Amino acid sequence: QALQRQPAATLVAGATDVGLWITKHTRAVADIVHIGDIDALKQIHNNDTALHIGAAVLLADLADVLGTWSPDIARVLSRFGGVQVRSRGTVGGNIANGSPIGDLAPLLIALNAQLSISGPSDPRTLALENFFLRYGEQDLQAGEFIDSILVPACDLDGFSCWKVSKRFDQDISAVLGAFNLVFEDESVREARICFGGMAGLPQRASACESALLGQPFNRDTLAAAKIALATDFEPLSDMRAT
């Protein structure tokens, strides 16, 4: 209701990033709506088909659950900022912020996550990879907000992810890569590969994926995928050295 009255308001839950807009970048934020204490948005539950994550679930609480899916996921989530950030920052906030170097988006895109979006019109579901339109722009209309994230249950035998940063922890990513391969008869049946820090938004490596699909998982295939990967992105040679 508050958002309907003030559709241009900035939503905050943990405010770990919005706080920096104000204190470090001296941005004027006129209207703020706090959603961090709404119980319906703080729920996280798992069943046989999917993990349902409320938008206001803390990053620390996400790590306790999603981290059990894969040792790689657990390692990446343990390096997310520091203890203070993980204890205040939220899943929905990290996604809605739209940062191209956010740690969650590449990982969740590789896991085929879906967003549940509420607003003045009917609720809608959107693939996370389609949420990011271009640098600084996300698919949210006035008065809309992310209410939850759904991660389908899947076989993670072919899943891996890693983070590169100047410090091991308490640092933002220079590059984060997430790789989710499904094998059948020693060939690659499905491939979802996503990077953060390689473009103006979290983005799948479509050429690399195509080079892997239907191919035997061997050195020759990986060499071809490596060549294809070089065509997927044109990273900036900026201060983050991506």
Label the model's feature ranges:
Residues 1-241:
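C-terminal structural segment of proteins
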